[in-house]
Amino acid sequence: GSCLELGKYCDGSKDDCQCCRDNAYCGCDIFGYNWE
């Protein structure tokens, strides 16, 4: 899957949110992150 750019917000895409979780740099509601 693709990874979101730094500071971008995840819209719920599984791949993007997994990347967000793994790298901990972008917002993703389903993992409890809400970073701007």
Swiss-Prot record:
It holds the Pfam family Toxin_34. It is found in: Secreted. One of its GO terms (cellular component) is extracellular region. Coiled coil: none annotated. Expressed by the venom gland. GO terms for molecular function: toxin activity. Its main location: secreted. Keywords: Secreted. The keyword Secreted applies. Not toxic to mice by intracerebroventricular injection. Belongs to the neurotoxin 04 (omega-agtx) family. 03 (type II/III omega-agtx) subfamily. This is U14-ctenitoxin-Co1b. It comes from Ctenus ornatus.
